[in-house]
A protein has these predicted regions:
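Conserved catalytic or metal-liganding residues and their short signature motifs at active sites
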Residues: 1-250, 288-293, 297-305, 313-344
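Conserved SxxK-family serine transpeptidase/carboxypeptidase catalytic domain
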Residues: 240-287
């Protein structure tokens, strides 16, 4: 065989070998490497994770770790690990997976109606990386609260219920600073001016709003309920709000899981500044986290002459309002008879 034929043959062999090798590499990089059956899943890589830890997190979700490892090394992923929340989709190949691990997907963080700052910290810890203790320590730090005009009692009013976008690996300190910023944004010039017109601070508005929030779930009724409490405050009357008594009992016993369906005379005797049957004015802080509709209901309360209200037996969730104690007692008696007939 002539030399040039040998060279040609060797060239063909080399090309075929290179092609075969290239194809095998291609298959490893671009073949489907997902093992789960769901359409998509999220995985979470903690702050400071090593490459080995990333593999452990991925192990249940990919078909061939060696294929992923080879691709990750070629794309320098082990030297550039990012913490966060990442989206994996069915049908992804190893190249797709590495690319996905470089795209931190935000969390739509939500919260509402927590009664205590501890409950709030627990709710947030379910949605971002820091644990509830680190979040609680961050948001109850005295220096932080004082710098933003809050106390331990009013701290919960800093957090305005809504949906916010956060990266999962947001730190506790970053979270609290963002929330302080959102609070300032919420209390814009218009809302602040309305609070000043009521001779109230934003914290006092939130305080009263928490009572309104607990009194009625009917958003359209909240301005009317707020009007009752504004009338009582302006007349120097006790608020006598049942939700404050329930909160006072829970705080006094340390049990916020207990369910109190009806306020009894024994509950009215609890010695707590949150008991508005015994102590005048607003309680020291919110009895829950009021939502935006309750805050705006106080700022835009309905002007009327009502001083009392009780649950309505005819309109589920709504209340009957009265201008005099005599009329209120009639309304309350009707409701109590109805409750007794229901066997409650």
């Amino acid at each position: 065989m002539k030399l040039k034929n040998i060279i040609a043959l060797l060239s063909v062999v080399i090309v075929l070998g290179a092609s075969a090798y290239g194809y095998s590499i291609y298959k490893k990089i671009f073949a489907d490497n997902i093992s789960f059956s769901e359409r998509e899943i999220f995985i979470h890589i903690p702050t400071g994770a090593t490459y080995n830890q990333v593999e452990e997190i991925l192990e249940p979700h990919i078909s061939d770790m060696s294929k992923f490892r080879m691709t990750a090394e070629k794309k320098n992923y082990p030297q550039n690990i990012r913490s966060g929340r990442f989206l994996l989709k069915k049908g992804m190949n190893s190249n797709d997976i590495v690319n996905a691990l470089r795209q931190n997907v935000p969390v739509k963080l939500t919260f509402n109606n927590q009664e205590t700052i501890e409950q709030f910290a627990g709710r947030i810890a379910q949605q971002i990386e820091p644990d509830s203790l680190s979040i609680l320590q961050a948001i109850t730090d005295n220096e932080f609260l004082t710098s933003h005009g809050f106390t331990q009692e009013t701290a919960i009013s800093m957090f305005v219920p809504n949906t916010y976008e956060f990266f999962w690996n947001t730190s506790a300190l970053q979270f609290r600073e963002r929330m302080a910023k959102e609070h300032r944004k919420f209390w814009n010039t218009e809302r602040t001016a309305k609070a000043e017109a009521l001779n109230m601070t934003p914290q006092q508005v939130s305080n009263l709003a928490s009572i309104v929030h607990k009194e009625t779930v009917k958003v359209d009724e909240r301005p009317k309920v707020a009007g009752v409490y504004m009338n009582r405050l302006n007349k120097g009357m006790l608020l006598q709000a049942d939700p404050t008594v329930i909160f006072a009992v829970k705080k006094h016993t340390g049990d916020f899981n207990q369910v109190i369906k009806r306020v009894l005379y024994k509950h009215l005797e609890v010695d707590s500044p949150y008991n508005t049957y015994k102590f005048s004015g607003l309680p020291p802080g919110p009895i829950a986290m009021p939502d935006i509709s309750a805050i705006d209901a106080v700022l835009n309360y309905e002007k009327h002459d009502y001083l009392y209200f009780c649950a309505s037996m005819d309109r589920n969730g709504y209340h009957e309002f009265a201008k005099t104690l005599a009329q209120h007692n009639i309304n309350a008696a009707k409701y109590q008879r109805w409750v007794s007939q229901q066997g409650y």
